Amino acid sequence: NGRRLRRELALSSDQKFIVASAGGGRSGYRLMTSVIDACELLRDRLPIRLEVFTGPFMEKEEFRNLTARNTADFRIRRYTKRFLDYLTAADLSVSLAGYNTCMNLLVTRVPALVYPYSRQQEQPLRANRIKTLLPMKMLNSADIQPVPLSNHMDQLLHHPEIKDAPSVDFNGASNAARFLDHWVDESVINM
């Protein structure tokens, strides 16, 4: 639950909570570094708290470089079992555009900045489709420099584009079970 997590983290009501994530971590170092740099600029303008989840597969050296930047308001970790709670509690998500993260963004509806991994066609395609359903902005390589990124973050924190909840059915498992039950029943009848 997002409100409970905000209480656990002792976030003040005026503090903006930002969650940055790199999926598995193999290709997220540049973005995570830029997010931390941008948040250093942003905290001069407003009170923020940053949680960075690098993913379990980020190179050890890269992870060490990031964790060297831990502060009271910036915490860098590999992962959390409560990622959905963190997104639900967040005022903003900054991430790559991997499948799991995008599905989590759809469920939590948190305003998001996504930087699709350009070496995979699916991430830009997915992000382009999902941005029509959420308060989301797609970033390019120029956008992830610290100054423009901090400006994009500030903009979305203060003026998220409100969109109607998407008409997405998140009950895939139960729908599949119902379909299989129906299919098996039909197969038995037709035997």
Predicted regions and their residues:
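Alpha-helical elements of the RecA-like P-loop NTPase motor core of helicases
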Residues: 29, 61, 84, 103, ...
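A donor-sugar binding/catalytic signature common to diverse glycosyltransferases
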Residues: 81-125
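C-terminal amphipathic helix plus adjacent low-complexity
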Residues: 150-191
